[in-house]
Amino acid sequence: MSFKVGFCVSGKGRLAMSAIRNAQRIGIKPCILIAEHTADQLLESFCCENEVNFVRIPKLPRVDFDQKLYESCTKQVLDLVCLTFDKIVAPRLVEYYKGRIINVHPALLPAFIGTKALERAESTGVRFAGATIHEVVEEVDAGAIVAQCLVSLGYMEKYNSFGSKIYKHLEPMFLQTLNWYATGRVFKDEKGRIWVRNAVYGGIPISPEIEIKFPE
């Protein structure tokens, strides 16, 4: 496995850990997990057990944080950087990994750009919610969409409930997306939209459709 991937995490790191556990199956080599100070304390031991480099960035002034993140990412020779990050990434890092950095956003972009997307979805009374994996560009949550998943909301359903429903689709979608990148199937058309070569589009709840079967 020569497709080298780095992960930047602010919370529990469930998606990153799942990718590391399934690395051989999806054809990636996890190289580094960079954790914000808010990230789960168990991530370091998990990375140690799985022979993945680990860096925790303490609470720092913004300029110092950006510098530490940049140094930690660029020190590695990475093919792809995956963000499940609460912070906006500095333009210098976005430029360095242009076209090779993706983000997981808990909403159906271009709706609910920015923070607290699930809470805002609940407050507006939408009937459907979901998650988006997209390319990272300097403008927040404005990069080309790679994949999306969709769930319907029940009567008076709270965001923590439909957030759990979303995650059931988000995890396999995330793993499959890494596999698409690793196998060189992701490309851009003349309008700058991202597509996956030979993938099946138009289905629900995930588009493009998942090709690898992952255990529940």
Role assignments for model-derived ranges:
Residues E36, C82-Y201, P205-K213:
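Donor/substrate-binding cores of folate-linked one-carbon enzymes
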Residues A16, L43-E44, D66, L118, ...:
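A general structural signal for well-ordered alpha-helical segments in protein cores
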Residues M1-Q41:
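N-terminal Rossmann-like dinucleotide-binding module
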Residues Q67-V77:
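Short, well-structured alpha-helical segments in soluble
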Residues F7-G11, A35, I57-P58, V81-F85:
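Small/polar loops that bind or transfer phosphate-bearing groups
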Residues P30, N53-V55, L80, I101, ...:
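Hydrophobic beta-strand scaffold residues
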Residues A19-R21, S45-C47, L93-Y96, T115:
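Short amphipathic alpha-helical segments
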Residues I26-K68:
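Short, surface-exposed acidic-centric catalytic microdomains
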